[in-house]
């Protein structure tokens, strides 16, 4: 099949096409070899419940363009009603993922495959993605060491293949792709510009998070009467990154209340040791709270890994399956996992998934 670059690789030019043969893992854009899933194919499905547009005429006149009329109050009501409905829905949820960097997004994506699991993502920044919008030192390319490239195949992110690693031409391509797929799923809600100020603790178990608007959380020294809100959860996944003003907040709070002994911080950089250690030590550190991503290095003293991102993705996936295990659901760790995918939203990535969807 032939896919227009305008819809897949924006910025390559109107005359460039991304050609992909189903059953083949290679593609070519302007002479650069790219790779996508070997078995990827666009699946046809029933029309979604809501339409992308009420108007089917593509030949509109840009010189005399007119929008449909609307009352300002309708805009306010639509935004407010939906947000408040989401807050009510997720006031008591299955999993809260704190931090929407590459590990948190990968975790939420994996969890969202089960449409019966409610997932709330809490991100203090207006723009989710953490450090995954760029590679190292503000450079564009994202490096992912093998075999983590299989996750890129699943979510349909093109890359250039090298011997032991792959290169995504811009890190934003990964982040925007996984977010667009994840947030389209009805069992997921992203609460960005919201900070997790504290944890809900019952006995020896983490039972949710204390939330507030990020701007309030950042200005408690001048705003003394801004009480927070809460989200109860069966499982909290802390993916708050390495130490910083809003970094490693989950494990630092556990240390301050004596639920863990220490947070030694990450050691100096060693890419080869770091990525294996991050995935290996992703775990439930106390009942009800799983730690993933670079926050794992803070609690275990693992080396920092620098600008390689594979461990973030796989650590996030492992955290998701730890959460599924904690919920008593099928998971990869117990060897009984069969993803219940959203057939109307995802690209088939394996023959088995295609057959079961």
From Swiss-Prot:
Its cofactor is Fe cation. One of its GO terms (molecular function) is iron ion binding. Residues 1-51 form a transit peptide. Its EC number is 2.4.2.60. The keyword Iron applies. It is an enzyme of class 2 (transferase). One of its GO terms (biological process) is thiazole biosynthetic process. Substrate binds at residues 103, 123-124, 131, 196, 227, 242, 294, 304-306. Involved in biosynthesis of the thiamine precursor thiazole. Catalyzes the conversion of NAD and glycine to adenosine diphosphate 5-(2-hydroxyethyl)-4-methylthiazole-2-carboxylic acid (ADT), an adenylated thiazole intermediate. The reaction includes an iron-dependent sulfide transfer from a conserved cysteine residue of the protein to a thiazole intermediate. The enzyme can only undergo a single turnover, which suggests it is a suicide enzyme. May have additional roles in adaptation to various stress conditions and in DNA damage tolerance. This is Thiamine thiazole synthase 1, chloroplastic. The lineage of its organism: Eukaryota, Viridiplantae, Streptophyta, Embryophyta, Bryophyta.
């Amino acid at each position: 099949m032939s896919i227009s670059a305008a819809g897949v690789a924006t910025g390559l030019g109107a005359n460039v096409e991304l050609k992909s043969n189903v059953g083949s893992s290679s593609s070519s854009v302007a002479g650069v070899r790219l790779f996508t899933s070997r078995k990827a194919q666009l699946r046809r499905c029933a029309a979604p419940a809501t339409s992308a547009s009420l108007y089917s005429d593509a030949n509109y006149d840009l010189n005399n363009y007119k929008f449909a009329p609307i009352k300002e109050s309708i805009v306010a009501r639509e935004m407010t009603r939906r947000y408040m409905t989401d807050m009510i829905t997720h006031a008591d949820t299955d999993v809260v993922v704190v931090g929407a960097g590459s590990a948190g997004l990968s975790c939420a994506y994996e969890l969202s495959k089960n449409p019966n699991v409610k997932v709330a993502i809490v991100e203090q920044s207006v723009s989710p993605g953490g450090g995954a919008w760029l590679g190292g030192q503000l450079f564009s390319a994202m490096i992912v060491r093998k075999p983590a490239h299989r996750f890129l195949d699943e979510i349909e992110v093109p890359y250039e293949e090298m011997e032991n690693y792959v290169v995504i031409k811009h890190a934003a391509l990964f982040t925007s792709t996984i977010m667009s797929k994840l947030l389209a799923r009805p069992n997921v809600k992203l609460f960005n510009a919201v900070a997790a100020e504290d944890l809900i603790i019952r006995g020896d178990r983490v039972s949710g998070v204390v939330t507030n608007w990020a701007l309030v959380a950042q200005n408690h020294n001048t705003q003394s009467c801004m009480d927070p809100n809460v989200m109860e959860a069966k499982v909290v996944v802390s993916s708050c990154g390495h130490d910083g003003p809003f970094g490693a907040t989950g494990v630092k709070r556990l240390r301050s209340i004596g639920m863990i002994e220490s947070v030694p911080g990450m050691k100096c950089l060693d890419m080869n040791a770091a990525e294996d250690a991050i995935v290996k030590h992703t775990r439930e550190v106390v009942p009800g709270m799983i730690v993933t991503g670079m926050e794992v290095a803070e609690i275990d003293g693992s080396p920092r890994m620098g600008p390689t991102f594979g461990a973030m993705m796989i650590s996030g996936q492992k955290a998701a399956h730890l959460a599924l295990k904690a919920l008593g659901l099928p998971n990869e760790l117990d060897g009984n996992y069969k993803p219940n995918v959203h057939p109307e939203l995802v690209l088939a990535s394996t023959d088995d998934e295609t057959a079961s969807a």
